[in-house]
Curated annotation (Swiss-Prot):
Signal peptide region: none
Gene: eif2a
One Pfam family linked to the record: S1
Name of the protein described by the UniProt record: Translation initiation factor 2 subunit alpha
SMART domains listed in its UniProt record: S1
Length: 260
């Protein structure tokens, strides 16, 4: 069960629950992120239209996303609404919850690796990660991408930082996109070949690969985490190598498609 660092949700929060009781006047749902807590959805908060039969809208064991209307910790009451939430908000919140389920599983794997329970993991590191990074998965993702120092920097213990990073790197793969562009490079100097090689080598990196299609055309392949970043890197790489050639009395041009 994914856990929140706070005991109760707050007014306006979007909560994930499982409906466990449906009555004529409303429904009760166990809250997935608040252990032992439940929310009540009155029939008037089920749909914006007239509800003749509440079971046409909610049923037992159904996963729901609802907006918190009122919280009374003294009475143990949470009132929530299904109608005061847009469909895109509902979808995003459910996706977020599923991602956090995966993160909790990674935390559990990390804990077992050092002979600790999930409860101990939350108390010793889980809530700290949530406080520092917003949610558990973000902490694991950053550890996978940047290494254990990102955890050490927020006072995660070396033991936890090491094992969380190991588990993250094994189980989280950063999504990648790849785009391609082409440059035509021509040099009229006696050392023109060396100038072009220098220009192409200047743009090669972990994200940028250069291939010769056939003089004067060269393929530039960019691999990174998203398309806007890839387009920016491709444009900068093409401009850089063309600039070097032109500074040496040559010519260069960039095109996205391989010309016949």
């Amino acid at each position: 069960m994914v856990r929140m660092s706070k005991e109760w949700p707050e007014e306006g929060d979007l909560i994930v629950g499982t409906v466990h009781k449906v009555l004529g006047y409303g429904a009760f749902a166990k809250l997935e992120e608040y252990e032992g807590k439940e929310a009540f959805i009155h029939i008037s908060e089920v749909s914006s239209g007239w509800v003749k039969n509440i079971r046409d809208y909610v049923r037992e064991n159904q996963k729901i996303v609802a907006r918190v209307l009122r919280v009374n910790p003294k009475k143990g009451h949470v009132d929530a609404s299904l109608k005061r939430i847009r469909e895109d908000q509902r979808t995003r919140r459910m996706q977020q919850w599923k991602i956090e389920q995966k993160a909790e599983k990674l935390l559990e794997i990390s804990a077992k690796s050092i002979n600790k329970t999930l409860d101990e993991a939350y108390d010793e590191v889980g809530y700290l990660i949530m406080e520092e990074f917003g949610d558990l998965y973000e902490g694991f993702e950053l550890a996978s991408d940047d290494g254990e120092n990102v955890l050490l920097d927020v006072d995660v213990s070396p033991e936890w930082a090491k094992i969380i990073t190991e588990v993250a790197k094994k189980n989280i793969s950063t999504p990648e996109v790849q785009i391609t562009g082409y440059v035509d490079l021509t040099s009229y100097k006696s050392n023109g070949v060396e100038i072009i090689i220098e220009a192409l080598q200047s743009i090669e990196s972990d994200n940028v690969e250069v291939q010769c299609v056939g003089s004067p055309t060269y393929r530039i392949m960019v691999t990174t985490e998203d398309y806007p970043t890839a387009e920016k890197i491709l444009s900068e790489a093409a401009n850089k190598c063309i600039g070097i050639v032109e500074e040496n009395d040559g010519e260069g041009s960039f095109h996205r498609e391989l010309e016949d």
